[in-house]
Amino acid sequence: MSYPLFDKDEHWHKPEQAFLTDDHRTILRFAVEALMSGKGAVLVTLVEIRGGAARPLGAQMVVREDGRYCGFVSGGCVEAAAAFEALEMMGSGRDREIRYGEGSPWFDIVLPCGGGITLTLHKLRSAQPLLAVLNRLEQRKPVGLRYDPQAQSLVCLPTQTRTGWNLNGFEVGFRPCVRLMIYGRSLEAQATASLAAATGYDSHIFDLFPASASAQIDTDTAVILLCHDLNRELPVLQAAREAKPFYLGALGSYRTHTLRLQKLHELGWSREETTQIRAPVGIFPKARDAHTLALSVLAEVASVRLHQEEDSCLPPSS
């Protein structure tokens, strides 16, 4: 497929990937930068999956009027074609919907997974909805975007939002970045913090538990205890009990965890509360070195988060 395009300044543009990212904050900022500088941009959203797909429902990309784009709505097989469609529609000013893979008129664009996807292309008219989303995420609050194809409008939903079609609009829910709170003066803690730096998570490592740290624990936080000392764990566990992080894991053997549970029950913890603690921490049994343990812990955190995100998607409309 060729990509000649005639823009308002009578220049030809070809779609070009600006950089690789699937981080929604980076994608939305890319759009905001264009709009704030007076340039046009299109928001592309994955709104339907038929069969398998490489990206989740609600995945997005942004295409600027100069042809540069970022984000993913597939495994990389339709992004250039979608960018071409976005550039073409900027001239008309009319939003559109396109299908790729199964059920698509484009026989030369095949999804390796064998399924099909539907994308909506919305010409952004204001940066305000995107700025509102970014501001909520900066405040570590859940937020959503609602796109109405008939009105060709985009609005911010200042509340927790499930991704999917809702009445005549498609809504995308966003959660704050995962925050890792790692506690312990140990090789395991250092290795976990080092590996976490590559994940894009907001990572913090502590030796002792500062009083100010309890305010940083929220429902998008993973609390990881790598202390080798049950008594030093207790202030962190008590803070986590109130804040309810989505993940709470602790280092130690089954015997150590039995002692931990005894201490917590003495402090008034219920059985339901103590079952929220993942111990021994990690998905690999009996990890014997620090880096394997770090990988095991972060894999478990990612798994729990993934299940949480899957639960936030609406079932397909009938």
From Swiss-Prot:
InterPro entries: MoCofactor_Util/Proc, XdhC_CoxI, XdhC_Rossmann_dom. It holds the Pfam family XdhC_CoxI. One of its GO terms (molecular function) is protein homodimerization activity. The keyword Chaperone applies. Keywords: Chaperone. Disruption phenotype: Mutation results in complete impairment of cell growth in the presence of cinnamaldehyde. The keyword Chaperone applies. Transmembrane segments: none annotated. PANTHER family: ALDEHYDE OXIDOREDUCTASE MOLYBDENUM COFACTOR ASSEMBLY PROTEIN, MOLYBDENUM COFACTOR INSERTION CHAPERONE PAOD. Homodimer in solution. Interacts with MocA. Chaperone required for the production of an active PaoABC aldehyde oxidoreductase. Stabilizes the PaoC subunit and is required for the insertion of the molybdenum cofactor into this subunit. Binds molybdenum cofactor. Binds the molybdopterin cytosine dinucleotide (MCD) form of the cofactor after its formation by the molybdenum cofactor cytidylyltransferase MocA. This is Molybdenum cofactor insertion chaperone PaoD. It comes from Escherichia coli (strain K12).
